[in-house]
């Protein structure tokens, strides 16, 4: 074997092209590159739901490093652990996990600074392009950014903590901006160098890239005199280490680095035939991608990009992309203050960076970018308002879909196309992730979310239920299990399967500490709705009275239990702060107590007005995901609490389900939700009429020439949200069934209405962040549409 390696080293005849680099640095360079590959492998273990294996790998390598006696730092290991803990923290939002991530990422910041100084001091050139220490500027920016996000997302952070987080964000922004400019300036050099390395690799007959050893070049043959035995032995060792690093990178890119079988060829368009009315998508996609690079040549490109350069590029793109998107989501009042000091975000630029990273990078940065995109587009909170779409640009009408398979570069025109219809591209990348990481339910959860966003609720719940029903499947990461169970519970609620929904919400008590009171309140609301379904005869039961008593008892049990889990309420004294939905449920229960005093002889379930679960469904974007059948059932159930003979009420003088008079405040909530349901069924004009006559007119007293409104407090989120939803009604009416579409006029009219929503929604109120993000998303989307015309 040694003889073979000697021969290989002789053939390659490695020699330095940079005389100012000390020879003993080459061992250190390869040691660092190997550390980076180890760190990337550890983070891949997390992506495959094998976090313990990843953590043990990092601990083992850190111990070996400390025992080696080397003065060379290993600053990548703390970052790898910090990234893993960051992902766990942001999946579950549990205080103790977030605090642990905060500590580790702070250590990673310090380690990165120290490693950067070391590389500069000893001129450790780990890149052909960037000066020594650049990679640890990136790890510093990454740890600073993730640390700032953890600090911002902690539920019990105060003003001081928030200020510290924003300061960290700004520091990360400055570092990333500096490195990003270097990357853009060096792009021609990088491409030229990649071509050169590929050419050298082909000519050396061994197809081993020397990209990880800056300062060396390969010659096709050795000189007739050969070299000294000492230099030859050194070359053999370098070649041995170089080959190990190459194989590590190769395994990571091909998906075999975790011991999993190499993923089979993935059909990126599988399922599109069923989910789109346009059957030509697959064939047209094949046409549109005929000139793209093949997977083999794409993999070849990846293998000849050094691990460090790959990390720098993907890390900067990911972090800068996240930063730009996060800053674009910050409410306008804070955003204006930050922009004064040159600190502002651009959502479109940020999303393009995330897409580019997710498509071209097979490492933690690529998969984290994909997760960000999936949460942004298909997550439970509406960060982007895809409802503002131009006629003819709907997903079902797009005939020319790009294939993302094997792409190592993405052009600006391709990114623009992807941003117009993101739902056609996230499933492609998700298929790849599921193939590379078959053991992680996180990717299955994301697939369920994508299916739900496409209106395939039944498929989504079947996928998620069958996974947990299979005893051979294990979910090691508790945060992922909690997310899967919560989302599945919401999807069941969207389908009016209230038994399964309530079961999932109650189960969350044992696996997640986010907001146990809210979980129980949701379960109680589901049991209440099942009670109403039985009362209205919408489900067949053998013994109606027995079933009514059963669901009444369950609803009362969990309504009474829910507030006992709310922090700092009653006897539950704790350092935790109440979350927005904790305040929501406490307000709802206060309303019930007031009605109990008003109607002392009525049963608890008869004191409740508008459907609580339907109100909660709105916050999780349920009406955009329901089928026509589910929407029609929602209309019937919402009518349960309506005043006798009122519009869209199920109650009349001869037959009535409700036992209490419907207050104006409760009627406003009911009509608001019914208007949204009507719009989702295609009855846009009717829905807008309901919204204006029964909701907005109750607090808007003047529209022209000056907008005036009365401040109402019964349901704080409702008043700005109703005006926000009116914006969507206006857009649909102005852009549908018109012979001559005036996009600019439609945008302006919609923005005028949105401005009124912002005026009504000024200040801090219950669920203000959620409402504010929706309005910000709508405003950004309208700006985008306006600039295009």
UniProtKB/Swiss-Prot annotation:
Any Pfam family matching the protein: Iml2-TPR_39
InterPro entries: Iml2/TPR_39, TPR-like_helical_dom_sf
Main location: cytoplasm
Subcellular location: Cytoplasm; Nucleus
Superkingdom per UniProt: Eukaryota
Annotated keywords: Cytoplasm, Nucleus, Phosphoprotein
GO cellular component: cytosol; mitochondrial outer membrane; nucleus
Low complexity composition bias: residue spans: 218-231
Family, per entry: Belongs to the IML2 family.
Keyword tRNA processing part of the UniProt annotation: no
Segments for region (Disordered): 209-231
Subunit structure: Interacts with lipid droplet proteins.
Name of the molecule in the record: Inclusion body clearance protein IML2
Function: Inclusion body (IB) resident protein that interacts strongly with lipid droplet (LD) proteins. Involved in LD-mediated IB clearing after protein folding stress, probably by enabling access to the IBs of an LD-stored soluble sterol derivative that acts as a chaperone in inclusion clearing.
């Amino acid at each position: 074997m040694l003889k073979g390696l000697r021969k290989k080293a002789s053939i390659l005849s490695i020699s330095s092209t940079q005389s100012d680099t000390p020879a003993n640095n080459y061992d250190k360079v390869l040691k660092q590159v190997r550390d980076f590959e180890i760190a990337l492998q550890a983070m891949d273990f997390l992506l495959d739901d094998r976090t313990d294996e990843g953590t043990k790998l990092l601990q083992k390598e850190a111990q070996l490093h400390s025992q080696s006696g080397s003065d060379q730092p290993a600053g990548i290991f703390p970052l790898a652990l910090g990234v893993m803990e960051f992902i766990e923290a942001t999946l579950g939002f549990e205080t103790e996990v977030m605090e642990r991530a905060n500590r580790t990422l702070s250590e990673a910041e310090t380690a990165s600074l120290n490693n950067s100084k070391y590389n500069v001091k000893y001129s450790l050139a780990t890149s052909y392009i960037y000066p020594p220490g650049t990679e640890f500027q990136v790890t510093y920016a990454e740890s600073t950014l993730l640390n700032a996000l953890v600090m911002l997302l902690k539920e019990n952070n105060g003003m001081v903590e928030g200020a510290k987080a924003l300061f960290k964000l700004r520091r990360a922004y400055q570092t990333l901006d500096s490195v990003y400019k270097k990357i853009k300036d060096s792009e021609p050099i990088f491409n030229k160098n990649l071509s050169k390395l590929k050419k050298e690799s082909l000519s050396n007959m061994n197809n081993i890239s020397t990209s990880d050893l800056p300062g060396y070049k390969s010659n096709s043959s050795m000189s007739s005199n050969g070299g000294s035995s000492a230099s030859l032995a050194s070359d053999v060792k370098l070649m041995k280490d170089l080959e190990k690093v190459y194989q590590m990178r190769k395994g990571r890119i091909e998906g075999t680095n975790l011991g999993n079988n190499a993923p089979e060829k993935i059909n990126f368009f599988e399922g599109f035939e069923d989910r789109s009315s346009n059957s030509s998508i697959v064939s047209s996609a094949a046409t549109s991608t005929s000139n793209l690079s093949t997977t083999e040549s794409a993999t070849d490109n990846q293998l000849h990009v050094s691990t460090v350069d790959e990390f720098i590029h993907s890390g900067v793109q990911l972090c800068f992309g996240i930063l730009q998107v996060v800053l674009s989501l910050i409410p306008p009042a804070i955003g204006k203050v930050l922009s004064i000091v040159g600190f502002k975000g651009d959502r479109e630029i940020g999303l393009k960076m995330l897409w580019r990273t997710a498509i071209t990078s097979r490492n933690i940065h690529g998969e984290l970018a994909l997760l960000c995109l999936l949460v942004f587009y298909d997550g439970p909170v509406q960060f982007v308002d895809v409802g503002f779409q131009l006629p003819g640009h709907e997903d079902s009408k797009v005939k020319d879909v790009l294939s993302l398979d094997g792409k190592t570069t993405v052009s600006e025109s391709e990114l623009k196309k992807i941003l117009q219809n993101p739902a056609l591209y996230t499933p492609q990348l998700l298929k790849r992730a599921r193939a590379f990481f078959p053991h992680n339910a996180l990717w299955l959860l994301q697939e369920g979310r994508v299916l739900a966003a496409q209106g395939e609720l039944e498929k989504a719940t079947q996928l998620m239920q069958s996974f947990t029903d299979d005893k051979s499947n294990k979910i090691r990461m508790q945060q992922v299990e909690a997310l899967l169970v919560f989302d599945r519970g919401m999807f069941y609620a969207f389908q009016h399967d209230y038994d399964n929904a309530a079961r999932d919400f109650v189960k969350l008590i044992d696996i997640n500490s986010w907001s146990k009171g809210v979980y129980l309140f949701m379960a109680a609301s589901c049991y209440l709705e099942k009670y109403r379904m039985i009362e209205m005869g919408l489900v067949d039961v053998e013994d109606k009275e027995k079933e009514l008593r059963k669901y009444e008892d369950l609803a009362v049990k969990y309504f009474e239990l829910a507030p006992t889990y709310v922090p700092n309420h009653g006897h539950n004294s704790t350092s935790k702060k109440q979350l927005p939905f904790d305040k929501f449920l406490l307000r709802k229960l206060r309303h019930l107590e007031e009605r109990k005093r008003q109607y002392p002889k009525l049963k608890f379930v008869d004191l409740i007005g508008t459907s609580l679960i339907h109100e909660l469904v709105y916050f999780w974007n349920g009406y955009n995901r329901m089928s026509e059948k589910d929407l029609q059932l929602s209309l019937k159930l919402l009518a349960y609490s309506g005043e006798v003979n009122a519009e869209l009420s199920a109650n009349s003088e001869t037959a009535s389900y409700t036992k209490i008079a419907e207050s104006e405040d409760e009627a406003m909530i009911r009509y608001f939700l019914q208007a949204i349901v009507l719009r989702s069924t295609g009855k846009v004009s009717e829905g807008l009429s309901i919204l204006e006559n029964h909701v907005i007119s109750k607090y808007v007293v003047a529209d022209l020439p000056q907008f005036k409104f009365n401040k109402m407090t019964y349901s704080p989120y409702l008043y700005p949200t109703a005006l926000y939803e009116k914006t969507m009604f206006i857009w649909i009416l102005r852009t549908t069934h018109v012979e001559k579409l005036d996009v600019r006029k439609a945008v302006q009219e919609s923005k005028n209405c949105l401005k009124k929503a912002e005026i009504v929604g000024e200040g801090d109120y219950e669920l203000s962040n959620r409402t504010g993000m929706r309005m910000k998303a709508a405003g950004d989307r309208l700006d985008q549409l306006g600039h295009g015309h």
